[in-house]
Amino acid sequence: MKDKRILSRFGIVILVLLALVLIFPSAKIDLASSIEASTQASVRVEHIQNFARSAEMDVQLLSADDPAYQQIANVLSGLTCVKRFNQQYSSYSHEYPVDSVTVSYYDDTENNNLLFTVYSDGTAIVNSQFVKVKAPKGGAEEVYRELAEIVK
């Protein structure tokens, strides 16, 4: 009887570990392959005064041969983004005012391949999913500074 209990507990532990192994590797988002599959991008730089109003907005359309496109692609391709499972839009708010840079990548048929938004307060969102950003020079705040410098 004792052996069956041990086997049962061991089986449950194995199932939990298997579930974790299946969940966590899929938490990483591959930005580089989405960027490589794209031929154009749009970049939106925003200064947001409060929840209801953007004070300033600048939108640029970039083709793959544009130097700014290449610089942005180099910055984003070097990032590691991991999904945050515990953060939802409804429970998140910024300290206003806040600035943001949003990059949308598209293929030849104008299908959206990637939507990346980073805020000056260090928040990052990829394809409507909050992410933790790891960059060679820091986190999301540093990525925001790099992208804002490229598009200004």
List PLM regions with ranges.
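Function-determining sites in protein domains
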Residues: 2-152
